[in-house]
Amino acid sequence: MGLDDSCNTGLVLGLGLSPTPNNYNHAIKKSSSTVDHRFIRLDPSLTLSLSGESYKIKTGAGAGDQICRQTSSHSGISSFSSGRVKREREISGGDGEEEAEETTERVVCSRVSDDHDDEEGVSARKKLRLTKQQSALLEDNFKLHSTLNPKQKQALARQLNLRPRQVEVWFQNRRARTKLKQTEVDCEFLKKCCETLTDENRRLQKELQDLKALKLSQPFYMHMPAATLTMCPSCERLGGGGVGGDTTAVDEETAKGAFSIVTKPRFYNPFTNPSAAC
C-alpha cells in the first residue's frame, strides 16, 4: 500500500442494503465482464470498519467503489428518513394533543354558554312582569281575536314594547285559561243536570212501585151491572094493563124479541085442609 492508500483509510458506519461477501467477491472478480449489478442479492447489514479493509478493495475496482457509494447513500437516506418520520410523529402527536385540548376547551365553552343561556332564559321568564296597561291592552285584543297572525303579533309587540314570542306565549296561556274555565262551567252544568235527572228517576221509581202495589191489591172478579127485565105484553095485561077495558096493540116483532116468562097461576083454597073445618 502506498501513501495515498494510507491517507484514504478511516472508519465507516454503514446502514443499508449491502451484498454478502461471497456475492461481492464474485462481482469483483467478474468486473471486467458485462454484469448487471441490479441482480446482485442485497442483504441488510450494519458494519463499522476501516474503509477498504473489510471488503479488500483493490486499486482499479470501480465496481466495489460504486457499491460502497450506493451503500453509504442508502444508509444516509434511511437515517434521514427515520429521523424525519420520528419528527413527523412527534409533530403529529403534538398536534393531536393540541387538537384534543382545543376540542375539550370548545366543549367546555359550549357547555358554559348553554348553561349561561339557560340561566338567561330562566331569568328572563322570571323577570317578565306586565303592567296594568299592557295587561288591559292584551285582554282587549284577546276579546277581539283569540289568535293572532304574524303581522298582528308584530304590531302588538311593538305597541307593548315586548318581543313577539312573549306576546305569542301570553295568548297561548290565555287560551288555555279560557278553555279551563269553560270546562269548569260545563262540568258544573252537567253536575246539575245529573242531579235533576237523578231526582226525576227516583220519583218515577216511586210511582212505579205504587202502581205495582195497587195492582196487587185489586180483586180477581169484576162488578157486573144490574140486569134489566122486560115483560111480555100478556104479562103486562095480567099485571093490570087491561084496567078500564083498554087494550094496547103490540107489534109482532117486539113481542117476538122480548124475553117472556110463563108462570102457572096458583090459587090458595083454604078448605082443602080437613083440620080447617073444625
UniProtKB/Swiss-Prot annotation:
Q: Which GO terms describe its biological process?
A: abscisic acid-activated signaling pathway; response to abscisic acid; response to cytokinin; response to water deprivation
Going by the UniProt record, its keywords in alphabetical order are: DNA-binding, Homeobox, Nucleus, Phosphoprotein, Transcription, Transcription regulation
Record SUPFAM superfamilies: Homeodomain-like (SSF46689)
One Pfam entry name = HALZ
Give the Low complexity compositional bias ranges: 72-82
Q: Name one GO cellular component term.
A: nucleus
DNA-binding in keyword set:
yes
Q: Which residues form the signal peptide?
A: none
Taxonomically, the superkingdom here is: Eukaryota
Gene Ontology MF terms: DNA-binding transcription factor activity; DNA-binding transcription factor activity, RNA polymerase II-specific; transcription cis-regulatory region binding
Say if the entry is tagged with keyword ATP-binding.
no
Instruction: Spell out which residues are annotated as carrying Phosphoserine.
Output: 92
* Region spans: Disordered: 68-103
Give start and end residues of each DNA-binding region. Answer: 123-182
Family (UniProt): Belongs to the HD-ZIP homeobox family. Class II subfamily.
| Its job | Probable transcription factor.
What is this protein identified as? Answer: Homeobox-leucine zipper protein HAT22
**Species:** Arabidopsis thaliana
Q: What is the lineage of its organism?
A: Eukaryota, Viridiplantae, Streptophyta, Embryophyta, Tracheophyta
Q: Which gene encodes it?
A: HAT22
